[in-house]
């Protein structure tokens, strides 16, 4: 089991959530791939979109419904600074995850996070579990709570 997957499992256990982490043979690098593999609507997939703060260089995480896009201006306003593209090295260094497997929890460093209200419309949502092939399902309020994210409007 990878270190990334272990960190997510530990974060779930520490939060008292008894959820199953599933390995998807087809991979879940995109929201469409994940929805197909999980047998759910695309908006039930939690996309982890990371930007880099231009002022401090720190990662800012936007947890959005799979069919939504992050509006850069709204995201920057929420973050209180201009946001730029986060490269794979920054994402790996600050979260410990590779692109395509960024979980909403279990990051190497604390991360400021925002949560798409669209995700609250479902009984269950699916998120990456630390690798591009692993996912877990939980209730939206559970992921919101354990991620420490703030519900906010940042989509286009």
Residue map of PLM features:
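Extended, low-hydrophobicity, polar/charged segments
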Residues: 1-156
């Amino acid at each position: 089991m990878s270190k990334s997957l272990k960190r997510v499992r530990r974060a779930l256990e520490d939060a008292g959530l008894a959820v199953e982490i599933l390995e998807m043979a087809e991979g879940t690098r995109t929201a469409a791939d994940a929805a197909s593999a999980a047998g759910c609507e695309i908006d039930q997939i939690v996309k982890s979109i990371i930007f880099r703060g231009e002022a401090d260089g720190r990662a800012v995480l936007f947890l959005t419904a799979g069919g939504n896009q992050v509006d850069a201006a709204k995201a920057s306003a929420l973050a209180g600074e201009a946001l730029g593209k986060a490269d794979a090295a920054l994402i790996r260094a600050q979260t410990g995850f590779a692109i395509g497997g960024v979980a909403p929890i279990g990051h190497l460093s604390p991360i400021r996070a925002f949560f798409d209200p669209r995700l609250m419309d479902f009984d269950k949502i699916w998120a990456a579990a630390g690798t591009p092939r692993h996912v877990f399902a939980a209730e939206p309020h559970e992921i919101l709570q354990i991620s420490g994210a703030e519900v906010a409007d940042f989509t286009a």
